[in-house]
């Protein structure tokens, strides 16, 4: 398949995914979660192209989260700022510092490298929603690709997280919430995204997060790459399995509610972000990490990682941020 | 079973730690090194149950147990699984599938002990109690596909025989069946067809899964021909965890719950898994502690997705011994199928009265078994597979099309040869026990079609 045909097939597949799943309707204001990495850069580019070509009539925005990681996030945000100019999409940046009073640099100083991904994942998820609310958008789209979703299916099986297992393959989540999230790249392979970015010479930032240098090489990610080499369709087969799982009706699922402090969605009295923030502000950063004594019921919807011993967590850490659904 | 047999001790089996520090890690490493040296899961601390001073054995969950308590723990899980799922009734004959590996060896030992105890109770009660269930043992001989020297294979099979005959009260019978017998009663013809069918499968994983299907078919055949009411497998939590991930990777998320329950009645002879809650490491260790002889020279080297999954899980287990249980527990929360429990009228009549209400409740909730099962592996069809089957039925020109449509997507992709001619030849080789069912359905289907055509002709005549 030649380059031009690859472009057409790649873009049409994504278009088909968008249309068949009714991801958008005309007039929607859509925020693209933009990290500067290859997935979100390609997503911004392709969505902009398809919006023109197929006349979706969407208002597109770039939405970035500044975690406050010196030497990493500031550089990647420069990439997004260039994308803003290149693609003509307005950019909104929201930072942990503004929202929480803490940067990731501060957090890592307080708790060390271990577990800092828990804070970052929980905070980023909420920050994205808050940024979307400020932009008054109707939808958020993220660049999660097929490899990410397959990895999440496996991780949820490994962790015994049945609540997440039941919804991690949804192409749209949070439809009953204020701002739904969509994954147009749900069926798109990571290697195709890389190839597309390469041939189109798209400007993206590819350095991994400095605070989780080995996160990319988690066991699950490595396993999925081995699978893909052995049987390329395994990634889509995993997603299909995830879609076909039927949860037993006798399994108790966590109930949705709101945090009594900040109003964010939560199955507990306080959302995970407030619990973690409270710990930081009180000088007890370990609060909210690991096993929680005396807390009954299901996990908080915001919780990125299941409550597991520290020793086992690192091996299951997926790519930075991408396992957070 | 093969996966269970292939499992091995993976070093220290310490329970999970809520926190870790440098010194704790150092102690842990030392313990791991020591454990590795003795080649078993052992820590020098007191038994968590009886407090005895003997060398303790660590089990998943962090509890240290002495040899006796460890054994009692596993036997307790086995007995609980058997009784709380009504796996064996007093009138049943049970066929235990024995591969020579640690898991089925333990299952053999435990079911034997349960039977001995039942016999003692029966004797004491002067024959007023219920009769005692019977036990037979089956070994599926796959040596025709094995590349090892014939005499080595013969010795291994002789070991299998001696293990079974060494049990103090003899089992009812020992059945050794060659895998190729499911193809044909004539030895050479069966062998030829088996080899030819296997050689036509291009995918390593597909070949493995095909052999697994044949193994189940062979066990079913032995059980039906010899009057057994149940087939007991030694599948343990570790093998089931591997299966959960393998099935997920093959797109079988819909049907996977069928394979991980204690009871599976979709087959002619129901299949039960009493060791579902025990880990391969624990069973291997028990074989060592009790000097239970195993025979694993017949294990075949494995490539493909199944072995990739097994090595992945082994790696996870080394980091967290409870991981396998977590995986199985996740799968337990998926919805089982109607055939994952016994539902025949009167099935639970032999149960002690205190247990009966639990099962009767289920009986009243019972719905009709309506799943369509894959021709080869027996997986229930998902909605998309059913749709494909329905559309094929309407436009099927040849029998081959119906055969193909009755295979699940996983078998279709990894087992069926590409190309229609090859496909036709492949199906002609398959055991009649599989294709015969299809022929029956196909005949009734064409009969129905004939009736419809006659009706249309009559309608036409009336019109004239």
From Swiss-Prot, chain B:
Keywords on record: Cytoplasm, tRNA processing
Major subcellular site: cytoplasm
Pathway: tRNA modification; 5-methoxycarbonylmethyl-2-thiouridine-tRNA biosynthesis
A GO CC term assigned to this protein in UniProt: cytosol
Subcellular location field: Cytoplasm
Gene Ontology MF annotations: nucleotidyltransferase activity; sulfurtransferase activity; tRNA binding
GO terms of biological process kind: protein urmylation; tRNA wobble position uridine thiolation
Record family assignment: Belongs to the CTU2/NCS2 family.
Job description of the protein: Plays a central role in 2-thiolation of mcm(5)S(2)U at tRNA wobble positions of tRNA(Lys), tRNA(Glu) and tRNA(Gln). May act by forming a heterodimer with NCS6/CTU1 that ligates sulfur from thiocarboxylated URM1 onto the uridine of tRNAs at wobble position.
Protein name: Cytoplasmic tRNA 2-thiolation protein 2
Gene: CTU2
């Amino acid at each position: 398949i030649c380059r031009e045909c690859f472009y057409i097939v790649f873009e049409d597949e994504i278009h088909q995914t968008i249309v068949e799943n009714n991801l958008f309707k005309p007039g929607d204001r859509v925020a693209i979660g933009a990290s500067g990495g290859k997935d979100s850069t390609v997503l911004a580019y392709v969505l902009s192209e398809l919006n023109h070509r197929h006349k979706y009539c969407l208002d597109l925005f770039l939405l970035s989260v500044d975690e406050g990681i010196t030497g990493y996030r500031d550089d990647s945000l420069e990439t997004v700022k260039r994308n803003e100019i290149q693609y003509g999409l307005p950019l909104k940046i929201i930072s942990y510092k503004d929202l929480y009073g803490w940067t990731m640099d501060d957090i890592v100083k307080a708790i060390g490298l271990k577990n800092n991904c828990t804070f970052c994942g929980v905070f980023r998820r909420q920050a994205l929603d808050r940024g979307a609310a400020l932009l008054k958008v109707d939808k958020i789209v993220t660049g999660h690709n097929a490899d990410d979703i397959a990895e999440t299916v496996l991780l949820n099986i490994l962790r015994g997280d049945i609540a997440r297992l039941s919804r991690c393959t949804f192409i749209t989540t949070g439809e009953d919430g204020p701002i739904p999230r969509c994954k147009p790249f749900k069926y798109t392979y990571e290697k195709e995204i890389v190839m597309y970015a390469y041939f189109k010479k798209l400007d993206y930032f590819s350095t991994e997060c400095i605070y989780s240098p080995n996160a990319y090489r988690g066991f699950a990610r490595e396993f999925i790459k081995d699978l893909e080499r052995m049987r390329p369709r395994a990634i889509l087969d995993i997603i299909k399995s995830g879609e076909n799982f039927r949860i037993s009706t006798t399994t108790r699922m966590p109930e949705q509610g709101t945090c009594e402090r900040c109003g964010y969605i939560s199955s507990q009295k306080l959302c995970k972000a407030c619990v973690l923030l409270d710990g930081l502000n009180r000088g007890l950063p370990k609060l909210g990490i690991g096993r929680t004594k005396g807390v009954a019921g299901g996990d908080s919807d915001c919780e990125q990682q299941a409550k597991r011993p520290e020793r086992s967590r690192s091996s299951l850490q997926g790519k930075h941020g991408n396992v957070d659904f | 079973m093969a996966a269970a047999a292939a499992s091995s001790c993976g070093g220290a089996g310490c329970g999970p730690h809520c926190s870790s520090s440098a010194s704790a890690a150092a102690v842990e490493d030392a313990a791991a090194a020591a454990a590795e040296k003795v080649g078993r899961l052992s820590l020098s601390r007191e038994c968590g149950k009886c407090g005895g001073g003997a060398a303790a054995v660590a089990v998943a969950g962090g509890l240290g147990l002495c040899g006796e308590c460890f054994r009692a723990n596993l036997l307790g899980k086995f007995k609980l699984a058997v009784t709380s799922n009504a796996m064996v009734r007093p009138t049943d004959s049970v066929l235990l599938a024995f591969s020579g590996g640690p898991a089925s060896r333990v299952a053999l030992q435990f079911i034997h002990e349960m039977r001995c105890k039942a016999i003692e109770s029966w004797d004491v009660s002067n024959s007023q109690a219920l009769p005692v269930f019977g036990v037979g043992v089956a070994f599926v001989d796959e040596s025709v596909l094995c590349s090892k020297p014939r005499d080595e294979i013969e010795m291994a099979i002789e070991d299998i025989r001696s293990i079974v005959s060494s049990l103090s009260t003899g089992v009812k019978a020992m059945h050794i069946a060659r895998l190729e017998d499911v193809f044909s009663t004539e030895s050479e013809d069966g062998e030829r067809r088996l080899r030819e069918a296997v050689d036509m499968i291009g995918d390593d994983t597909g070949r493995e899964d095909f052999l697994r299907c044949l193994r189940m078919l062979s066990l079913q055949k032995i059980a039906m021909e010899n009057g057994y009411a149940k087939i007991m497998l030694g599948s343990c939590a570790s093998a089931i965890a591997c299966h959960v991930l393998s099935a997920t990777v093959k797109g079988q998320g819909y049907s996977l719950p069928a394979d991980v329950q204690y009871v599976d009645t979709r087959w002619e002879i129901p299949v039960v898994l009493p060791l579902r809650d025990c880990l391969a490491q624990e069973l291997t260790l028990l074989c060592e502690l009790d000097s239970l002889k195993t025979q694993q020279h017949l294990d075949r080297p494995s490539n493909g997705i199944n072995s990739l999954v097994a090595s992945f899980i082994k790696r996870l287990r080394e980091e967290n011994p409870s991981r396998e249980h977590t995986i199985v527990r996740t799968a337990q929360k998926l919805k089982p199928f109607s055939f994952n429990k016994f539902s025949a009228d009167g099935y639970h009549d032999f149960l002690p009265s205190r247990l009966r209400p639990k099962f009767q409740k289920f009986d009243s909730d019972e719905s009709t078994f309506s799943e369509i099962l894959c021709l080869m592996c027996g997986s229930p069809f998902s909605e998309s597979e059913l749709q494909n089957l329905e559309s094929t039925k309407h436009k099927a020109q040849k029998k081959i099309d119906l055969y193909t449509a009755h295979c699940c997507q996983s078998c279709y992709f990894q087992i069926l040869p590409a190309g229609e001619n090859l496909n036709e030849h492949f199906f002609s080789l398959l055991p009649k026990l599989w294709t015969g069912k299809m022929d029956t359905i196909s005949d009734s289907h064409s009969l129905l079609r004939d009736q419809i055509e006659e009706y249309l002709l009559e309608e036409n005549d009336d019109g004239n």
